[in-house]
Amino acid sequence: MVKPDIHTLAHHLKQERLYVNSEKQLIQRLNADLLKTAERLYRTSWIAKQQRINLDRLILTSAEASPAECCQHAKVLEDTQFVDGYKQLGFQETAYGEFLNLLRENPRLIASCLVTGEKLNQENAQSVIHTVFTSLYGNCIMQEDESYLLQVLRYLIEFELKESDNPRRLLRKGTCAFSIIFKLFSEGLFSAKLFLTATLHEPIMQLLVEDEDHLETDPAKLIERFSPAQQEKLFGGKGTEAFRQRVQAMVETNEAKLVALVNKFIGYLKQNTYCFPHSLRWIVSQMFKTLSCVEGLEVSEVRSMCTDLLLTCFICPAIVNPEQYGIISDAPINEVARFNLMQVGRLLQQLALTGFEERDSRNKSNLNKFDKSCVAAFLDVVIGGRAVETPPLSSVNLLEGLSRTVVYMTYSQLMSLLGFMRTVISSEQLQEEDRMALENLLATVPQTKPGKSNNDTPYSTPQLSPATTPACKKNRLPIVTRSRSKTNLMETENECSPQEVTPNQPEEVLVISLGTGPQLTPGMMSENEVLNMQLVDGGQGDVPVDESKLHGKPDKTLRFSLCSDNLEGISEEEENPCSTGPSNRSNSVSSLDLEGESVSELGGGPSGSNGVEALQLLEHEQATTQDNLDDKLRKFEIRDMMGLTDDRDISETVSETWSTDVLGSDFDPNIDEDRLQEIAGAAAENMLGSLLCLPGSLLLDPCTISETTSEAWSVEVLPSDSAPDLKQEERLHELESCSGLGSTSDDTEVREVSSRPSTPGLSVVSGISATSEDIPNKTEDLRSECSSDFGGKDSVTSPEAEESVHGPHHITTPPTQSESLLAMFDPLAPASSEVVRPKVHYARPSHPPPDPPVLEGASGGNEARLPMFCSHVFIHTDSEAYRQRHSCPERLVRSRSSDIASSIRRPISDPGWVRRGINEDRELLTGTAVNALINPPQSSSFSPSKDSSRGEPDEKKDSDDERSDRNKPWWKKRFVSAMPKAPIPFRKKEKQEKEREDFVQDRFYVAVDSTSQLGPHSQAAEDILAKYRNAIKRTIPNEGSTMPYEGADPVGDGESLHESPRDEALQNMTSDDLLDSANQVAHPQESAFSYRDAKKKLRLALCSADSVAFPVLSHSTRNGLPDHTDPEDNEIVCFLKVQLAEAINLQDKNLMAQIQETMRCVSRFDSRSCSKILSSLAEDYRKRASYIAYLTRCRQGLQSTQAHLDRLLQRVLRDKEVSTRYFTTVCVRLLLESKENEIHEFIQDFQKLTAADDKTAQVEEFLQSLYGAMAQDVIWQNASEEQLQDAQIAIERSIMNRIFKLAFNPNQDADILRDQVLHEHIKRLSKVVTANHRALQIPEVYLREAPWPSAQTEIRTISAYKTPRDKVQCILRMCSTIMNLLSLANEYSVPGADDFVPVLVFVLIKANPTYLLSTVQYISSFYSNRLIGEESYWWMQFTAAVEFIKTIDDRK
């Protein structure tokens, strides 16, 4: 195998580090931006819905609220304050949040209570209905809320409509709970708005263009619409036959126009049926299915009700008031147009019921002119859908994984809701099932009302309540976190009731937590966790495991399956393995598994060594509710706090010296949030599963996490080892805990340390510097990044690796931003990556990593890779151990790495070093293996034959061993039980490969073989080690507790250590592992530094090296030195010397310490070992491609979700704008109604004027007088400046509508005839003029977009606008459209006037808008003095084009 060049390797490692740091920072920013956007989205949504409800109150002008009160309330809503619920509810917020969450998740109970409340004639029933929609279900922004609300509607159909004597009358009345909720839902549903806009925009605009006359079809009403003078002029003498005939002719003309108009609406309805909202269709089909079963209800009656629901409650309101739904925005609808729209709606309803109901004869003539099945066909499509039980999603869920964690509700709404529920339950009218459910809910709610006095106890309420209640059965990534900032989540509505309106103070909306816990955000998983998941998946063989099965979720949204239901997925995956050993798991995970670790640990449970075991675990994924609760308690480390641990040996699980620290960390208030985030990290791991397309549970290998941390390096460990008053026995216990299973304990320890940012020793773990505080942020970043990589596969157990594991946890603590960021990604988690890697190498990786230039010879299959990490001495031994390592790479690696790492990490003089290494060995071995380790002669040299002979039999004895172990404390069980076996075929293949090779170095150690190959130092080391082994042997019986094994249990697999598939693998753990560790111990001066440790530190040094400082070595030197050469002279040391010189020159003390430590470790290896280290680093670099892919996908997912949230925010802002403008329009209408006399006088005066200037002056004067009156009106006292401007525009539109005919055609028939002449001229031109006509001279480059239909559409609607300002804006939009299309055609140049005017002329010819000359005259008369800037420029171009068209001779 060709050894990679150290310069190239260093270059690639540095590039990788820089890229990863950059991605992490970007992801962190994206996460922060995402939360801000979500917060703004929910806040805006809440306000917008309240504005809409306030608008409805204004339209109804009911007795409960005057227009002035509505306006005042609108002002208050704009200043709404969002405050955390605890500020008003105090510690009782949790109880209220639980109540609301459980109520929200019980649609049946809500429907039953609403129906019962209406039967009791509760005064606040309607306000409670609004609260349910706006607060409990948050306006259905989230699809989960939409699904719940659809279920509420379904139950309302069953409980309310089905039980009613006359359901149709109840529905038409519009005041029942079903009608109100359906209206609120359909108005806010975005897919419904899309359908209405697509269906109604074009026909309504066409109607506005042609709104000259009322389309009245009743002769009597038609006559009444004209004054006597007009009747005489139009129809002749009243009572004559000519009069009657002319009236009938006009009626028939109106009928023909109306039929054409209605047919246009029906055509658009049919064309857009495909985009009819699925959720509304589901409601209609549920109604039809439910009511069809009611005795006494004919199918025709049920169909009529469905028609009422669709047309009367959904489509027709949008037809009559399109501006209220945003269908028409800038085109005013005058009285004539409104009447015609009402006629269209009436006819549509009649047509829908044709054949099912008898209509009066007067309408028969109209209906006979239509295709009788036209509307019925549309209804059949909607009603005919299969009535499935599960509500459909209205659209693709782009926010999967994001979930609401709070509700918005005012205090009065909350009390009103509770009062309503208590009244309902006291009425005895609820069904028994619902009554009991409601009683259980209300039992948790405080009876006394919380007062403001609770404001003094804000901090007594936990900011983040752990998800321990049934309400938290789904822990999802909160879009909006429950931080002190006013996160918004749902809207509450009943601010509508007058008593709630506080005239002088803005409303306070309580942000009440639903009780769900915090979760990890995407992209925050450590490198180790990602690699572990990848490797665990690889260990399953070539058969991919469907992650969607593991998580019970579709695997479509990779980016956010990450965030969604992370904890839930993990808990399911853990359930089987963990349920048996909660104590071990909770201990190991306790404070140690902060972000990333907990993830891999928690998820690791089911990851078996072979696919069959994994599938078996999956089959049992569904656990009882209690199991779920237990799992979650474990995740939040609440079981320990609550005394719920069911493992009697917990005290033994943690060594005496460490237990205090570990448990203490559980209760350490300073890291509560860190731990919660850590747990969230677990969730993220789940998410990662999706990102990597790996099986979730398999990806989350417990071992991976714990491995990352190393015992020797944790702060706690060091003090405990060196404590002068510590008994030897206790030290040995600790040592034992550190080794083997003890490695778990180490992991735990390290994690704990990492969880406390202030604890010195983090940096010690990586060997970078003495304390974490001393290390600059960048150094920590490097360390965290590298630990996993260093270890790559090997570093899992190394101290840095362990630290890296801690890294993520550490990150959750308050250190600097970059630190915490890196920690979150915890690249240092080598352990996890290590452990998993073995599997990856032999399995097909889900993401093929790019080939790094460094790895020229590192390709190849298992064969090539094994030699990289294994020494020739352990060929046979390794075969079995290696196999197991692959089956449960994490655990195995941990045990191994912890052995070696421990031996390497501690000075020989430190008794803890020997104790630890030996204990680890002992933990790792079972039966003869343990004896061999304790026995000096055997431990000094394990024979390959012994190892290999041990491999196969152990496989068979695994199950028996496991059973025998179950009754023992876990620290006494064979370590083997903690490791799952690899699939048998895989093992055999490995074994064959190993046998084929002459040497295989242990994957994680620099291998040294038997004493025959040991140098004099090694022999001496063996002698020294033998003494310690004897000491340990004597103390073994007393060895009681060990921390959870680093690789095994930190994962949260507590007992799974023994019972999960990994246990077997660990049992079979290779003597080869032990051999390595023994040999390492045997050579304290030459081999004491573990292979992984050296590799980890070397990676740190290389990834921070500057290319300028690369030493210039000859090719021969670089290719390695002969074995007899002094280790000091190997090429890595030479390279590091140059780096050290640079560090000294720069006086970078931290870097100097790192490089010196790395040189100390590396100098112990010969050139051959150095070559293998470099090859291993290169291979690790290649395998980290999956981590890069993870970061990339997280970034893409966050960006996509951010874009979707931005779009949602745009929709909400648009809804808010539409509601506000329509509110202003209604207020203006009320104002003008009070000024009707003045307006009538103004119109009469205007008719008398003849000069255009006089008319313009009078219009301006009258408008100004109305503006002044508005300013004095009480309704407008609280209006904002923007509202006043909108009001002035609305007043102008209304007044100009009233005088439009007088102002537009001052010369009446003469103007009309003039326009008709030009219209005919243009009509002839359009037949002969083409885009390439010589008279136009349109440049050829712009002809590809001809005939510019969008611009033609814009100008055709100019007749729909009645004010000069609106007509100018219409012309402006047409010109802008043309310029955009021209720019699109030629992107290399900006179109000028010479390019634009010919196209404008062509568009006007083809569009041929009516009344073109009158339009020019109207704008020139009433708006010319206000034309400035862009408007003036485009108006000049427009008039020039019209003049040019008049000069074109159509005959030529």
UniProtKB/Swiss-Prot annotation:
It comes from the Eukaryota. Residues 588-601, 898-911, 936-946 have a biased composition (Low complexity). Residues 445-468, 577-587, 755-774 have a biased composition (Polar residues). The record marks R172 as: Arginine finger. GO terms for cellular component: cytosol; endocytic vesicle; endosome; membrane. Keywords: Endocytosis, Endosome, GTPase activation, Guanine-nucleotide releasing factor, Membrane, Phosphoprotein. Acts both as a GTPase-activating protein (GAP) and a guanine nucleotide exchange factor (GEF), and participates in various processes such as endocytosis, insulin receptor internalization or LC2A4/GLUT4 trafficking. This is GTPase-activating protein and VPS9 domain-containing protein 1. It comes from Xenopus laevis. The gene is gapvd1.
